[in-house]
Amino acid sequence: MGGEEEVVSVELPAPSSWKKLFYPNKVGSVKKTEVVFVAPTGEEISNRKQLEQYLKSHPGNPAIAEFDWTTSGTPRRSARISEKTKATPSPDKEPPKKRGRTKSPVSKKDAEGEKSEGGGEENSHVKDTEMNPPEGIAENENVTDKNGSGETERVNDAKENIVAEETPNAAPVQEEGESMKEKALDSVDDKSKETDKEKDTGSIEKNSVDVEKKTVEASDEKKNSEAETRNHEENGLTTEAEGKEKTAEGEATG
């Protein structure tokens, strides 16, 4: 009654020269099923890490994607998809083209062309008016021709007035130029006056210096004259003293 339960294994399809064994676990174990791959060398591999290490150390074996760890005979869908992607090279996909705008922006050249066309229309309109004057002016000319030479003078005067109104008056421009010249001359005169004033002030300063020198010289002369007079006075006093001494000596001897 207490004998060990026999371990039953089921062989499933596996890669070439490999075996895939399915072992139902004992009752009470964590995993319900267990798959083991048996290598051509007889080594049993029970997890993916062992399989990776074995394939690295033993080159020439099938790819790791061919090993199915499920209990079914066919590999998993992800493995099959990965094999297909590896087998068939992916064609170069062109990037999706961006949708073009419905309204293309107007380029600068087109805008310039429209402007030039608009300017040409205006110029042509002006030329037409010059070639074909308004009806009122044409009627006046016809009337003057019918009335005679007196009326032609009036028409000519009217034309001159129109031309005078159309042509800009050049007088203000000339007046502005003359006013600018006058301002420039005034500024030159002011500068010359300032230089003359500076010269005058310089000459005045020189004169004041000369006057000061003269006053100093005069004071020096006065001092010299006073010193001379003092010397003369001292000499006179000494002569008087000498005379008094001589008279005193003469009286003493007599």
Swiss-Prot record:
It is found in: Nucleus. Expressed in leaves (around hydathodes), buds, flowers (carpels and pollen grains), stems (around nodes), siliques, mature seeds and roots. Residues 56-254 are annotated as: Disordered. Transmembrane segments: none annotated. Keywords: DNA-binding, Nucleus, Phosphoprotein, Transcription, Transcription regulation. The modification Phosphoserine is found at residue 116. One of its GO terms (molecular function) is methyl-CpG binding. GO terms for cellular component: nucleus. Residues 4-74 form the MBD domain. Disruption phenotype: Variety of phenotypic effects, including aerial rosettes, serrated leaves, abnormal position of flowers, fertility problems and late flowering. Residues 80-97, 107-130, 151-162, 178-254 have a biased composition (Basic and acidic residues). Gene3D superfamilies: Methyl-cpg-binding Protein 2, Chain A. Its main location: nucleus. It comes from the Eukaryota. Transcriptional regulator that binds DNA independently of its methylation status. Required during plant organogenesis and development. The methyl-CpG-binding domain (MBD) functions both in binding to methylated DNA and in protein interactions. This is Methyl-CpG-binding domain-containing protein 11. It comes from Arabidopsis thaliana.
